[in-house]
Amino acid sequence: MDCYKREIETLLRSREVSGFQLLDLQDYTGQGTALVGVLNAMMENKGLISAEKWREFCAGTVVLGEFASFTGMMGEDIRFDVQISECDPEKRHTRIRCTLMDGERELYACDVTPGARQGRLTDAVSVTFPAECYRDAMQERITGLTVVLTLEDGTRNHYPIWLIPPIDIRITREGIEKDGRMVAFVSAEEKADGAAIVVPSAEGQLPAEYCTDFWCYPMFRSISESMGKPVPVGTMGLSIDTASPLLKRFAQEDYTTPAWYAILQTAHVQRLPADIHPAVQMIDNTERCARLGILYQQDGVWHLTARLWEKPDDPTVRALAWSLWEALK
């Protein structure tokens, strides 16, 4: 649903398009089996999202937030822009309520006046939440908060964000070092002596990329093969065991969030036997249906396919490294 939201909101922010078409709102059983719908083939809700949440970003009136990043450092102000997409030419809006929430607890709120309207879309207006407003919500781990935008008629939208504490940690090709203690990166299980994590070779493996299956993987695979083009990766996003001790200080959602984006850019997926249940795995398409691991335990040794040393200064990479170090030191 996050991919749908991003796609639709990108279109709504553009003054160059007058509308869009979803292909399709329901699962489609022709041209292969396309399980792409928010609804099933009988037009019933599949439980992925409620109708109310769907209409936050797909409706005649949508209040839009635009963020440079959905992750940030604790102690920094939260900055974003707001706009309104309004299809009714007679309807006018006078206020956007911007609220920062920690679960059900309101941390900060302010009102802004919408920008000048040109056609369907208003001009963007900048909003800043000062760092002091969320200080009481901070934890010794990545902290998830929510920005809620509300119009005077009750129209609302929301955006999860993740704030990362400063971490005194060193990430190199050799391993993760903190407080004089090292968790080593090794290339094979037989080298995993003491505090170590195996980083297997990416040779012959799929990259840790994914794209929502907007249609049908077998059809696009066969088209790519017939045209001599690269075959789509065909993976569908992460499934995460949030109870894993290795993720105690990291993001606690059981699906892909922006906290994982930089990490996945350094990773591949490892084909595994079906009896291994990874802490972090990539969901495969229904045709290939392989067990694809990113963080998993095999023969009593933890493996991680992400090469964290490639992005040692990225805050989310450092946060994951900290969580791994805490569990394995």
For the regions a protein language model found, what residue spans apply to each?
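Flexible loop/turn segments at secondary-structure boundaries
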Residues: 27-34, 101, 107, 205-207, ...
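Surface-exposed, short loops/turns at beta-strand junctions within beta-sandwich domains
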Residues: 134-142
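Beta-strand-rich binding/interaction modules
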Residues: 76-115, 122-129, 141-152
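Short alpha-beta junction capping motif
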Residues: 179-222, 230, 302, 327
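Low-complexity, Pro/Ser/Thr- and charge-rich linker/hinge segments at domain boundaries
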Residues: 161-185
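Short, structured interface segments
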Residues: 42-56, 146-167
